[in-house]
């Protein structure tokens, strides 16, 4: 569809599937305006959720989800995850060292129990996310994390990465 919303002051538009119709007075009142504004905000939020969902799903591969995989250190966890991406042909050989270099600059952990390690350069064949969810936390910088999402970024798809990354935090 080319439009998401019809504003009808004639009360002659019939409701349609997947299309919102707002009935208003012939001369739009404050109440009508608030109703329009509310529906527009809902539609924008739905669209943002849909875009985020689609971009996030495009990062995911079922073989790159693991539960309760533990390593002795952050470095070992990064090596394990990055080397798996290399072995699958998704990331180049230099990927592991690039992720470790990035992590050395500042830890990629956050106070919401999530770490998002990623490479300094956009070098993977496609945008990819490798997720490990652990019951027991791993100390990662100043935070304990239970969800590790290693991100590989493709140069041509880097704006999608920025969008997903900013919406994950």
What residue spans do the PLM features occupy?
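Cytosolic covalent-transfer regions centered on His/Cys nucleophiles
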Residues: 4-5, 9-169
């Amino acid at each position: 569809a080319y439009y998401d919303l019809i504003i009808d002051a004639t009360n002659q538009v019939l409701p349609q599937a997947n299309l919102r119709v707002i009935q208003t007075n012939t001369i739009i009142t404050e109440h009508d305006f608030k109703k329009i504004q509310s529906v527009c905000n809902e539609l924008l939020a739905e669209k943002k959720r849909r875009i985020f969902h689609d971009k996030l799903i495009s990062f995911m591969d079922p073989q790159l989800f693991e539960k309760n995989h533990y390593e002795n250190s952050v470095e070992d966890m990064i090596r394990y995850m990055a080397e798996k991406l290399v072995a699958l042909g998704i990331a180049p050989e230099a990927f592991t060292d690039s992720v470790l270099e990035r992590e050395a600059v500042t830890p990629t952990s956050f106070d919401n129990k999530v770490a998002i390690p990623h490479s300094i350069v956009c070098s993977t064949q496609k945008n990819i996310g490798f997720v490990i969810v652990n019951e027991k936390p791993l100390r990662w910088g100043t935070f304990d994390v239970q969800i590790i999402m290693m991100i590989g970024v493709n140069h041509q798809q880097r704006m999608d990465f920025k969008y997903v990354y900013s919406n994950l935090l």
